[in-house]
């Protein structure tokens, strides 16, 4: 991500100023929590996609910074709510909001972040940015609910899996790129190209996340967390659709009833590896990455395009 950060270093600093301003509150408790959130910032991938998408079309302006802030506010709100739903005590190596301030406050904090983002756009009449991101909220909610609905019977098709990750992950990255582009591009076709570009990157990003569960390099061994949570992701879906009926029955039984037993989870991970699930998912991930790059190459060569290409490659090459 070095090139990406380098070409928009001053813009990223400006974004951080805007973001800190956006989350301020006169309520002492809320302001303290907001400061905690600002301090434990992540990789800022989504704001970077907003800023670079805008730079591809022209000069970054105040509307661009507001779009980047809205995207980050929305993303942070979903993470806070996710931690409550998943009962996660940690996020990015820090205690989660619900771990420190309990569930009720965490839910309200997520609501606050979302409302601040929407008001930021509304008060500045950034109606197109607001429309783009509101669509993302709808798709993300539908994606999460579809996953809950379909995961109950552990019989997920590839098509439904892609529909789920398109909604819960890719839609936000698609909206980030479209929102950024909408602040500088005048041609709606270019904005749509950037939306599609972001969607493809988001699909590749989620498949990479799903692969970590089966082949996590950073901790030396696969975690199997998705299996423990009864989540069917692409590597396992591929194996279930291509293995013998008896093995399929055995794997489904383990995921349903023995998902806390380390040796059983290890058996499932081994089957996914041996039967080509990891290889298949990796190919799909690179296919989405290549589709994203094809869309990006519609724009003339420039340092900004190079930076976006680097970010795309980072999403599939990262080790955490």
Pin down the residues of each PLM region.
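All-alpha prenyltransferase/terpene-synthase fold signal
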Residues: 1-320
């Amino acid at each position: 991500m070095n090139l990406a950060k380098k070409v928009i270093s001053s813009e990223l600093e400006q974004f951080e100023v805007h973001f800190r301003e956006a989350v301020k509150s006169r309520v002492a408790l809320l302001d303290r929590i907001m400061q905690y959130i600002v301090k434990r910032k992540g990789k800022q991938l989504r704001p970077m996609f907003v800023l670079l998408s805008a730079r591809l079309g022209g000069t970054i302006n105040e509307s661009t910074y507001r779009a980047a802030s809205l995207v980050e506010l929305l993303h942070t709100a979903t993470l806070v709510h996710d931690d409550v739903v998943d009962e996660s005590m940690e996020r990015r190596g820090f205690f989660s909001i619900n771990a420190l301030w309990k569930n009720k406050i965490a839910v309200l904090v997520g609501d606050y972040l979302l409302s601040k983002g929407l008001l930021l756009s509304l008060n500045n009449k950034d109606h197109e940015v607001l429309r783009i991101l509101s669509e993302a909220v709808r798709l993300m909610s539908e994606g999460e609910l579809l996953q809950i609905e379909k995961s109950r019977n552990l019989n997920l098709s590839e098509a439904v899996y892609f529909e789920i990750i398109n909604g819960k992950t890719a839609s936000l990255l698609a909206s980030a790129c479209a929102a950024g582009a909408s602040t500088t591009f005048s041609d709606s076709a270019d904005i749509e190209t950037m939306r599609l570009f972001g969607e493809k990157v988001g699909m590749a990003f989620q498949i990479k996340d799903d692969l970590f569960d089966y082949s996590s390099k950073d901790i030396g061994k696969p975690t199997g967390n998705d299996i423990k949570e009864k989540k069917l992701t692409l590597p396992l879906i591929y194996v279930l659709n291509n293995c013998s009926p008896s093995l399929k029955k055995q794997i489904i039984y383990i995921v349903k009833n023995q998902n806390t037993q380390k040796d059983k989870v290890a058996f499932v991970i081994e089957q996914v590896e041996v039967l080509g699930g990891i290889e298949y998912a990796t190919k799909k991930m690179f296919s989405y990455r290549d589709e994203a790059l094809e869309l990006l190459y519609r724009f003339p060569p420039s340092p900004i395009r190079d930076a976006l290409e680097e970010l795309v490659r980072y999403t599939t090459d990262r080790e955490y």
